[in-house]
């Protein structure tokens, strides 16, 4: 119901949220009259009712670009604590705060596509959140959002410099820095990194040893049947445009036998990642629709999503 109400005024939307929330709260009150629960359990259930709706309110504010004066008391009105350690691992709570910091940042900086916006947001999170457990989660989310966006390495460098000055969380800093360094390594013009693959005979190979043709690398999993079929259909279309390229179909799973059973095309070079965790970090495989174009000398020419190429 609430998702269908995004065209309403903000005031009416809040009334609908309050109405739905009241129904849920009354049901919980009735439940408590019949079943005895601990104070902690009561708190967690109340928050489980509240925060999915708080996240929806923040989404409404974002999508409709609602003026600050209409929602600046929202924390007070709903008795929201941004530093409740009991909710550190409660996803709707963290999602709410993450959206809230976006909307707060947008009050001062309307240029949401600029790297300065994300740096401002980083500082706002640092100022608003005193709980290290919650802050570390939000810092990590923001850093990964920035690094995985299709922005320039120079812009990412500016953000990372600020991030590492502010963040005191060593494990997260190391993780973020590793991602950033790997991104620099796979920018167009650089050599394709060393990644080991297995062929259909089980032999281990390094595709960089093949220097006779340009290459297209794409990825799939036998656990995702719909994607498996869709990606190969798209690759079939792409091959007409890149007929002078050798196509490598890379399975990301561990089982050699299951992989062999699920191969659906012999019109490509079928290989499997030997260590997906290592490969995904080196190649930043955050999306199975990502494809790599390599030159004959195995330099990275382009990294893109296959849908961008099919549509264009």
Where are the language model's segments positioned?
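Oxidative protein folding and maturation machinery
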Residues: 1-202
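Short acidic, S/G/P-rich loop/turn micro-motifs used as interaction or catalytic elements
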Residues: 148, 222-226, 254-256, 307
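A short acidic, amphipathic alpha-helical/loop segment
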Residues: 158-162, 230-237, 261-262
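Short active-site neighborhood of thiol/selenol oxidoreductases, capturing the structured segment around
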Residues: 205-235, 246-250
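Extended hydrophobic-aromatic, low-complexity segments
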Residues: 206-207, 218, 225-230, 257-260, ...
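Active/binding-pocket-proximal capping segment
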Residues: 222-223, 233-234, 241-244, 251-255, ...
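Short, internal strand/loop/helix patches
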Residues: 260-296
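Non-catalytic, surface beta->alpha helical segment in thiol-disulfide oxidoreductase systems
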Residues: 288-312
């Amino acid at each position: 119901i609430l998702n269908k109400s995004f065209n309403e005024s903000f005031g009416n939307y809040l009334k609908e949220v309050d109405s739905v929330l009241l129904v849920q709260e009354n049901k919980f009150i009735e439940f408590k009259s019949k079943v005895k629960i601990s104070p902690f359990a009561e708190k967690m259930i109340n928050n489980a009712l509240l925060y999915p709706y708080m996240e929806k309110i923040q989404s409404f504010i974002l999508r409709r670009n609602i003026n600050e004066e209409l929602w600046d008391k929202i924390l007070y009105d709903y008795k929201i604590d941004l530093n409740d350690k009991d909710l550190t691992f409660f996803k709707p709570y963290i999602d709410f705060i993450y959206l809230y910091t976006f909307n707060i940042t947008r009050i001062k900086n309307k240029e949401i596509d600029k790297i300065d916006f994300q740096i401002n947001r980083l500082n706002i999170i640092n100022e608003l959140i005193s709980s290290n457990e919650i802050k570390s989660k939000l810092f990590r989310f923001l850093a990964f959002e920035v690094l995985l966006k299709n922005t320039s390495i120079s812009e990412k460098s500016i953000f990372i410099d600020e991030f590492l000055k502010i963040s005191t969380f060593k494990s997260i800093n190391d993780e973020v820095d590793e991602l950033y360094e790997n991104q620099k390594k796979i920018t167009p013009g650089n050599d394709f990194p060393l990644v080991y693959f297995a062929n259909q005979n089980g032999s281990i190979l390094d595709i960089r040893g093949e220097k006779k043709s340009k290459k297209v690398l794409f990825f799939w999993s036998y656990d995702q049947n719909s994607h498996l079929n869709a990606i190969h259909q798209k690759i079939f279309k792409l091959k007409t445009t890149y007929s002078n390229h050798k196509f490598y179909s890379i399975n990301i799973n561990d089982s050699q036998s299951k992989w062999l059973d699920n191969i659906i095309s012999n019109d490509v070079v079928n290989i499997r990642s030997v260590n997906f965790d290592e490969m995904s970090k080196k190649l930043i495989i955050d999306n199975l629709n990502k494809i790599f174009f390599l030159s004959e000398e195995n330099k990275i020419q382009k990294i893109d999503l296959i849908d961008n190429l099919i549509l264009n």
